[in-house]
């Protein structure tokens, strides 16, 4: 069992529930994370389930990280890393990339990126749209229509369609009119045909063929469809996916594999927060489950189903419970909340949510301190403005009385959060705000992360576009994307434009591209095509077992130039390479094994004066470099072969449409000679075939590149990019594989961070949402060996110093989180390792992920109800709990929305661990400055009896 964890009877029942289909109903505080972790241990150790056959899905990344932390802290088995733990979108991304179902260079865009793309076709300023809630919703309809039409075209069942509101009654009428004019039935095929042929139907349905009213709605429909198509085509042309695509493409692939033979299925599945998943996500989970499954367990809570706006339905739990095979469990003990709070939660659940009282949990928490009598209270203020000030003053009192406790002001709307945050800042009270625009969605932070993204993958189109705009090459995102697309279309990477004059010692143009350098080497130099077999993938520590090579001039093998040596090692050689037996083990039995020093010296002498080339040469070059440092330090690879070529990079430049770039796949797809046997000599011959193929394509592209780069306008933009970003990029690349030192230029960043500021923002006033970090010195001390954070800080300081961005007052939260909660700089010291291990994870971060982490020193939080879900605080103040807001005025005649508002209020209540306060004003003024009485939310009618009443939030 987990350390210090003794399960109660209900928890033990769930832990031991193996085999069959199970549904666990668990209200907050019942210890789900502990149970889910212990189930993994038991399934492996007792039931014999392989970790790789386990699938653990959560609703949020934050929940997944929490579970991973618990797993790593309590299960010592290194193989537990094979368990997939994450949300559905994260799994779908991994599935699509891992199975080559999308182009390897694809990027995932968020809603802000999508708006930027669509604004180009709408002829609107993207920043105006981003700041206009109404316009954002109108744009969302277009995005939703695009995904909806995909589902209709692919024949998805109606129950799985997630954005049905993108087609309104007028749209249906318009399509019926079109079908009437055309003389065909109005069905799914007709809808798809209209969508795919907008211009044809625009010509067909002129004003002469329909009355004026019908003509207008037809034109509006066709305009919507045209925009949706343009958005779709733009994504397709630029290898972009939105979050809808991740789900849709995964479902399509799994659904087509009806025999379950092409893609991996899982025999042991557990899914948390199932009530928050939409029907498409549930269908994907069903398709991922092996038909001969061992155990499937869903966990949910009817009281917390608050994400209907994302397609989730409360009916999900009802449908699961009604399945004949379902074994139902209840967690009936709350281990988090004291009885006086649990009484409130249970009363509300029974009376407002109509939960059977027999299913509600009992208190399992024993109080450690006597009650003071002020744990539950109603706070009244005269007006909304007074309420903001009074609540902030009350928070200050709580901070003084309970300095180690956390306090959350939970609000119903982003505007409330802004008002409260502003008042907290005015009073100098440090806090962390989780609402409205997410820190991680800000253009400034996206720019910083784009720098990390291109260091990790220089083929990242979206990251380069953000950089090109961010460092001032273009003023708009659309222009930046067009420029980067023009480069990619000509097999040019933006990094090609960043080479310094020193890099071009042969006197070539500063902007000489990778293809140009390859063609020149191919035609003028002797190329050594080489490959290594190794004990593992760690370039810093693993040993080379075999080096094979051949010399080539103008695509022809130099006679007698074949080279192959086998090398001794004391390290363990893996018996398997994925699912195949490692052939190097048997091969070594038939060859003489040379010492490390002898073998490495032989290869260096063999390659002297030649250009090295490998497939995925970054790996081979760096593992060769570190083997030389250990065993033949007199040989300096940086001095003799600093500039090497990579056929993997060539293929990615010349064949961006390919979904996989492994040698075996390339030989098949491109119809080339060779064998990929995982023996270095065979792989060298296969690589040579790829190189010859690439030369033919590259030669044809060089003239096109020269013409493009010779254009004065392109040269001007390239010069700006090189001037503003070139030195930063080159210095970062030089640091990628540095493991044993901290750059001295980080010292200045440390000193600045110790004061809670960047060097470049020392004179800038703090922004409203964040306060100075009292423990910044400790944070800096921890971060001084985190290479990724150091790189992020360097780039940030450079941008602020050059006035390219405004200071990001919340950056210190991000760097602290990366340093303390994500990256283990002891196990992964270099920038290369940290980027390889965490680039994807970093790209998914949200503000709410930081709450509850060790990196947040603030004790006061301001959050909306939706973003508070899954979090807990010692003290909770539910702000402005008045009728008309809780529930919403527009929900009162809609039973479904009214019920969801009640569940939202339950979520807000149940965030409290120790103290709970309900705040309201008693009077509001309308636009004519006339006063109106305001009444307490009706959700309090059954629980008000538990609270002290008639006290002011100021205590006066």
What would you call each of these model-derived segments?
Residues 23-36, 40, 326-327, 334-429, ...:
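Helicase P-loop NTPase motor core
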Residues 86-94, 269-273, 299, 413-415, ...:
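Conserved helicase core region in the C-terminal RecA-like lobe
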Residues 1-105, 868, 910:
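P-loop NTPase Walker
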Residues 4-16, 20-28, 84, 110-114, ...:
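Conserved helicase NTPase motor core
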Residues 525-530, 535-633, 637-641, 657-674, ...:
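Conserved non-catalytic scaffold segment of RNase H-like nuclease domains
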Residues 51-169, 318, 643:
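Conserved P-loop NTPase-based nucleic-acid remodeling module centered on helicase motor cores
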Residues 473, 478-479, 693, 854, ...:
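C-terminal accessory regions
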Residues 221-224, 458-528, 536, 551-553, ...:
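Accessory C-terminal helicase-associated subdomains
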């Amino acid at each position: 069992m987990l350390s210090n964890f003794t399960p109660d009877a209900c928890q033990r029942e769930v832990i031991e529930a193996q085999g069959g289909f199970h549904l666990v109903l668990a209200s907050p505080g019942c210890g789900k994370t502990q149970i889910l972790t212990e189930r993994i241990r038991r399934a492996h150790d007792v039931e014999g389930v392989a970790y790789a056959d386990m699938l653990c899905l959560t609703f949020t990344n934050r929940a997944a990280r929490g579970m991973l932390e618990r797993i790593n802290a309590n299960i010592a088995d290194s193989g537990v890393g094979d368990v997939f733990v994450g949300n559905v979108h994260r799994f779908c991304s991994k599935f699509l990339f891992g199975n080559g179902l999308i182009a390897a260079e694809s990027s995932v865009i968020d809603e802000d990126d999508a708006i930027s793309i669509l604004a180009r076709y709408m002829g609107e300023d993207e920043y105006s749209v981003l700041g206009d809630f109404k316009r954002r919703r109108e744009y969302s309809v277009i995005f939703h229509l695009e995904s909806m039409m995909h589902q209709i075209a692919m024949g998805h069942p109606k129950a799985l369609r997630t954005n049905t509101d993108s087609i309104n009654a007028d749209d249906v009428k318009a399509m019926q009119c079109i079908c009437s004019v055309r003389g065909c039935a109005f069905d799914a095929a007709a809808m798809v045909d209209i969508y795919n042929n907008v211009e044809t139907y625009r010509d067909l349905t002129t004003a002469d063929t329909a009355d004026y009213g019908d003509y207008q709605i037809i034109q509006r429909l066709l305009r919507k469809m045209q925009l949706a198509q343009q958005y779709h085509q733009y994504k397709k042309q630029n290898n972009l996916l939105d979050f809808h695509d991740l789900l849709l493409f995964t479902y399509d692939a799994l659904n087509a594999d009806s025999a379950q033979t092409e893609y991996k299925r899982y025999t042991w599945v557990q899914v948390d927060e199932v009530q928050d998943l939409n029907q498409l996500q549930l269908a994907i989970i069903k398709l991922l489950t092996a038909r001969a499954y061992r155990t499937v367990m869903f966990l949910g809570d009817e009281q917390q189903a608050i994400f209907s706006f994302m397609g989730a339905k409360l009916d999900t739990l009802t449908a699961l419970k009604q399945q004949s095979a379902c074994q139902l469990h209840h967690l009936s003990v709350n281990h988090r909340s004291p009885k006086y709070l649990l009484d409130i939660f249970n009363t509300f659940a029974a009376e407002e949510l109509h939960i059977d009282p027999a299913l509600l949990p009992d208190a399992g928490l024993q109080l450690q301190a006597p009650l003071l009598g002020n744990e539950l209270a109603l706070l009244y203020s005269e007006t909304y403005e007074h309420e903001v000030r009074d609540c902030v003053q009350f928070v200050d009192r709580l901070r003084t009385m309970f300095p180690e406790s956390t306090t959350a002001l939970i609000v119903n709307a982003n505007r409330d959060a802004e008002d409260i945050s502003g008042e907290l800042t005015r009073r100098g009270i440090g806090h962390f705000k989780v609402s409205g625009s997410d820190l991680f969605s800000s253009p400034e932070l996206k720019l910083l992360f784009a720098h990390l993204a291109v260091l990790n993958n220089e083929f990242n189109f979206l990251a380069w576009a953000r950089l090109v705009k961010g460092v001032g090459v273009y003023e708009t995102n659309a222009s930046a994307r067009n420029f980067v697309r023009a480069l990619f279309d000509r097999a040019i990477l933006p990094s090609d434009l960043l080479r310094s004059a020193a890099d071009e010692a042969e006197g070539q143009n500063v902007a000489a591209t990778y293809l140009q350098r390859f063609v020149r080497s191919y035609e003028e130099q002797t190329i050594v095509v080489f490959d290594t077999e190794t004990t593992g993938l760690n370039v810093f520590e693993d040993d080379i077992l075999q080096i094979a090579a051949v010399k080539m001039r103008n695509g022809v093998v130099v006679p007698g130039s074949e080279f192959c040596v086998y090398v001794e090692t004391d390290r363990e050689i893996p018996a398997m390479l994925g699912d195949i037996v490692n052939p190097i083990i048997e091969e070594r039995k038939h060859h003489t094994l040379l010492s490390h020093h002898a073998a490495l010296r032989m290869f260096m002498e063999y390659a002297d004066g030649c250009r090295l080339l490998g497939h995925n040469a970054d790996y081979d070059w760096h593992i060769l470099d570190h083997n030389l440092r250990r065993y033949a330090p007199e040989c300096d690879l940086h001095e003799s072969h600093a500039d090497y070529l990579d056929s993997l990079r060539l293929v990615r430049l010349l064949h961006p449409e390919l979904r996989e770039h492994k040698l075996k796949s390339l030989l098949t797809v491109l119809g080339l000679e060779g064998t990929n046997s995982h023996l270095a000599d065979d792989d060298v011959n296969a690589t040579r075939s790829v190189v010859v193929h690439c030369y033919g394509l590259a030669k044809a592209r060089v003239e096109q590149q020269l013409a493009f780069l010779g254009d004065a306008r392109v040269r001007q933009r390239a010069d700006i990019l090189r001037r503003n970003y070139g030195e930063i990029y080159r210095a970062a690349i030089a640091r990628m594989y540095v493991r044993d030192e901290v750059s001295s230029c980080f010292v200045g960043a440390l000193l600045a961070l110790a004061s809670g500021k960047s060097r470049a923002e020392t004179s800038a006033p703090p922004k409203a949402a964040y306060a100075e970090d009292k423990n910044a010195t400790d944070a800096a001390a921890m971060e001084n060996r985190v290479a990724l954070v150091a790189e992020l800080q360097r780039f940030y300081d450079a941008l602020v110093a050059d006035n390219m961005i405004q200071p990001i007052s919340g950056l210190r939260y991000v760097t602290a989180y990366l340093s303390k909660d994500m990256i283990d700089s002891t196990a992964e010291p270099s920038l290369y390792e940290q980027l390889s291990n965490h680039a994807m994870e970093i790209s998914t971060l949200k503000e709410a992920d930081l709450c509850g982490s060790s990196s947040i020193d603030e004790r006061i939080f301001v959050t909306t109800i939706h973003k508070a879900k899954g979090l807990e605080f010692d003290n909770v103040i539910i702000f402005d709990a008045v009728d008309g807001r809780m529930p919403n005025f527009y929900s009162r005649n809609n039973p479904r929305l009214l019920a969801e508002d009640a569940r939202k209020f339950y979520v807000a209540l149940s965030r409290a661990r120790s103290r709970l306060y309900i705040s309201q004003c008693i009077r509001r003024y309308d636009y004519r400055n006339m006063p109106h009485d305001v009444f307490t939310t009706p959700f309090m009618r059954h629980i008000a009896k538990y609270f002290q009443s008639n006290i002011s939030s100021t205590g006066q």
